[in-house]
Curated annotation (Swiss-Prot):
Entry's family note: Belongs to the argininosuccinate synthase family. Type 2 subfamily.
Organism: Bordetella petrii (strain ATCC BAA-461 / DSM 12804 / CCUG 43448)
UniProt superkingdom: Bacteria
Subcellular location, principal: cytoplasm
Substrates-to-products reaction catalysed: L-citrulline + L-aspartate + ATP = 2-(N(omega)-L-arginino)succinate + AMP + diphosphate + H(+)
PROSITE patterns: ARGININOSUCCIN_SYN_1, ARGININOSUCCIN_SYN_2
Record protein name field: Argininosuccinate synthase
Name of one Pfam family that matches: Arginosuc_syn_C
Cellular compartment(s): Cytoplasm
GO cellular component: cytoplasm
Positions that bind ATP: 17-25, 43, 129, 131, 136, 194
Binding site for L-aspartate: 131, 135-136
Keyword Nucleotide-binding in annotation: yes
Subunit structure: Homotetramer.
Length: 445
């Protein structure tokens, strides 16, 4: 039985994730005028481009909401963001520059906390502004039904009557004006922006074209570091972790993780740290392009990974990275609270993050240009005397020890050489001729 309602449920309570923008404002007013009973829910995610959160519910009431609530999601957002960082739950990257899954993290928090608030109010129908081509329609669908199994979904943007009457921004603006609300469309940007405290996403419109890039973007969390007229001074920064939790920046301790994240954003933002341009695969397997900001998470992640590599052994780090990529993809798909994701996340938090205690000092310059200056931790397994090129007393191993170790390697070297000549016999490799080893066949010869 479908949980998606194709038409407006007249006479019933309908919760709408209300941003206060033109789309959700017009949708709320339209639903009220058509006979539904709209309830507005606004998530305070610490969006850097929002000035007055308290005004948003008031506007919703003016537009016809039966009730309007502002839900403070900031603490939960930061908690989930740090959990993602601890697990390295980031699978999209280009040449080592990471997208920190800030939108998927935000959707996990919004989708659960808003639906939980609706459930408290006896509202079991939910609508939001996600379109059928994007990732969010599936993320919100999953998180909503996980939170409230009785939930039904109504999306104005999937209702043909709504589309026919209010199919574009011009029509929505005129609809608001005729209803007595002086709602003027904001100037159209060359791209759309979605943000929360962890990061910002810029995409669509001109950014759909790959010959249009970061230079048309106006950052909202930091500086346009690529511009010559923007002054960016080098800055020395220290980040301290205790058992996987970031606790101090530049020697200042923060009891509130939200305040720490805000300060990390300010520090990283002064340099444009954490901006990236990514081509990614959406949930439906079509490729999209986005330009991202995440100055605070980027700063914390640099320090965290430095400590991880100095504390853990190679096999643990390999498992952390492989599991992190898998977990990042699950997060991206809206599966952050699925059992397989919880298993990967809890493992990383317990066996990787809990050992991460220490302080990293780095110098930030422009964009993602930085240098590591110092790494300190009581848990470091890095011991320079083990491999020092100088003569040391009580050396952990001797030349004779290494001779023995290399001699043992003869076993697998012999096996490998025999296997290569086995491949010659099967025709997979060409005979060596004048070369010391068999060669890959040249199909042109």
């Amino acid at each position: 039985m479908t949980t998606i309602l194709p038409n407006l449920p007249v006479g019933q309570k309908v919760g709408i994730a209300f941003s206060g923008g033109l789309d959700t404002s017009a949708a709320l007013l339209w639903m009220r005028n058509k006979g539904a009973i709209p309830y507005a829910y606004t998530a305070n995610l610490g969006q850097p481009d929002e000035d007055d959160y308290d005004a948003i519910p008031r506007r919703a009431m003016e537009y016809g909401a039966e009730n309007a609530r502002l839900i403070d999601c900031r603490a939960q957002l930061v908690a989930e963001g740090i959990a993602a960082l601890q697990a390295g739950a980031f699978h999209v990257s280009t040449a080592g520059i990471t997208y920190f899954n800030t939108t998927p993290i935000g959707r996990a928090v919004t989708g659960t906390m808003l639906v939980a608030a609706m459930k408290e109010d006896g509202v079991n129908i939910w609508g939001d502004g996600s379109t059928y081509k994007g990732n969010d329609i599936e993320r919100f669908y999953r998180y909503g039904l996980l939170t409230n199994p009785d939930l039904k979904i109504y999306k104005p943007w999937l209702d043909q009557l709504f589309i026919d009457e209010l199919g574009g921004r011009a029509e929505m603006s005129e609809y608001m004006r005729q209803a007595g609300f002086d709602y003027k469309m904001s100037a159209e940007k060359a791209y759309s922006t979605d943000s929360n405290m962890l990061g910002a996403t810029h995409e669509a419109k001109d950014l759909e074209q790959l010959n249009s890039g970061i230079r048309i973007v106006k950052p909202i969390m930091g500086v346009a570091f690529w511009r010559d007229d923007v002054a960016v001074k080098a800055e020395e920064v220290s980040v301290r972790f205790e058992e996987g939790q970031p606790v101090a920046l530049n020697g200042v301790e923060y009891a509130d993780p939200v305040e720490l994240m805000l300060e990390a954003n300010r520090i990283g933002g002064r340099h444009g740290l954490g901006m990236s341009d990514q081509i990614e695969n959406r949930i439906i397997e079509a490729k999209s392009r986005g330009i991202y900001e995440a100055p605070g998470l980027a700063l914390l992640f640099i320090a965290y990974e430095r400590l991880v590599t100095g504390i853990h052994n190679e096999d643990t780090i390999e498992q952390y990275r492989e599991s992190g990529r898998k977990l990042g993809r699950l997060l991206y798909q809206g599966r952050w609270f699925d059992p397989q994701a919880i298993m990967l996340r809890e493992t990383a938090q317990r066996w990787v993050a809990r050992a991460v205690t220490g302080e990293v000092t780095l110098e930030l310059r422009r964009g993602n240009d930085y240098s590591l200056l110092n790494t300190e931790s009581p848990n470091l397994t890095y011991a320079p005397e083990r491999l020092s090129m100088e003569k040391v007393e009580n050396a952990p191993f001797t030349p004779a020890d290494r001779i023995g170790q290399l001699t043992m390697r003869n076993l697998d070297i012999t096996d490998t050489r025999d296997k290569l000549f086995t491949y010659v016999k099967t025709g997979l490799l060409a005979s060596s001729g004048g070369a010391a080893l068999p060669q890959l066949k040249d199909a042109k010869k």
